[in-house]
């Protein structure tokens, strides 16, 4: 193989590897989003100091003194 052919092959391999890595980084973002959703406190659950309420909910105190994550009013 001559120099031009080697250069083209190297360019194609680099493009393929770059595409694979880009796909993996998107996958990592999805997995991290899933992980964040798992560790948040869902609606109608007691508020926890270690885990914030999930998006769309907020911590509200009840008459019994316990705070619960409740859905936000629109």
UniProtKB/Swiss-Prot annotation:
Signal peptide: 1-22
Subcellular location as annotated: Secreted
Propeptide: 23-35
Disulfide bonds: 40-54, 47-59, 50-51, 53-69
Residues annotated as site: Critical for the neurotoxic activity: 46, 50-51, 68
Sites annotated Important for the neurotoxic activity: 39, 66
Keyword line: Calcium-activated potassium channel impairing toxin, Cleavage on pair of basic residues, Disulfide bond, Ion channel impairing toxin, Knottin, Neurotoxin, Potassium channel impairing toxin, Secreted, Signal, Toxin
GO cellular component annotations of the record: extracellular region
Listed SUPFAM superfamilies: omega toxin-like
Domain comment, as recorded: The presence of a 'disulfide through disulfide knot' structurally defines this protein as a knottin.
Family membership: Belongs to the neurotoxin 11 (kappa toxin) family.
Name of the featured protein: Lambda-hexatoxin-Hv1d
Species of provenance: Hadronyche versuta (Blue mountains funnel-web spider)
Lineage: Eukaryota, Metazoa, Ecdysozoa, Arthropoda, Chelicerata
